[in-house]
Curated annotation (Swiss-Prot):
Keywords: Cytoplasm, DNA-binding, Repressor, Transcription, Transcription regulation. One of its GO terms (cellular component) is cytoplasm. The keyword Transcription regulation applies. Residues 59-82 bind DNA. One of its GO terms (molecular function) is DNA-binding transcription factor activity. GO terms for biological process: negative regulation of DNA-templated transcription. The gene is trpR. Homodimer. Belongs to the TrpR family. This is Trp operon repressor homolog. PANTHER family: TRP OPERON REPRESSOR (PTHR38025:SF1). Coiled coil: none annotated. This protein is an aporepressor. When complexed with L-tryptophan it binds the operator region of the trp operon and prevents the initiation of transcription. It is found in: Cytoplasm.
Length: 108
């Protein structure tokens, strides 16, 4: 037994996920690591970011749309504010492309 945790920071976890993705196994890894509630919370966070980046709804409207508390929306908004405009554009582009890719798969 070692005296410390094998994974001690976020970058190590990101490397683990990247390695799994290279093998095409990121989905089972994340499914194993996260409880259903954690996965649901992550889906909510992705939707929060998507709605905030679109900028069409108020935080209260997003809260009602997604069924999450206003404080949850505020935390997402505060996190977004800590990123550059370039990062926000990249994320919005990724979110839009991912949605379109999913729709294309459903049509097939």
């Amino acid at each position: 037994m070692s005296g410390s945790a094998k994974y001690s920071d976020w970058s190590q976890v990101m490397t683990l996920i990247a390695n799994a993705a290279e093998q095409g196994n990121h989905q089972p890894l994340l499914t194993m690591l996260m409880t259903p509630d954690e996965r649901e919370a992550l889906v909510a966070r992705v939707n929060i970011f998507h709605e905030l980046l679109q900028g069409e709804l108020s935080q209260r409207q997003i809260s009602q749309l997604l069924g999450v508390g206003v404080a949850t929306i505020t935390r997402g908004s505060n996190e977004l504010k800590s990123h550059t405009d370039e990062e926000k554009v990249w994320l919005m582009d990724l979110l839009e492309k991912s949605t379109k890719s999913e729709l294309d798969v459903e049509k097939e």
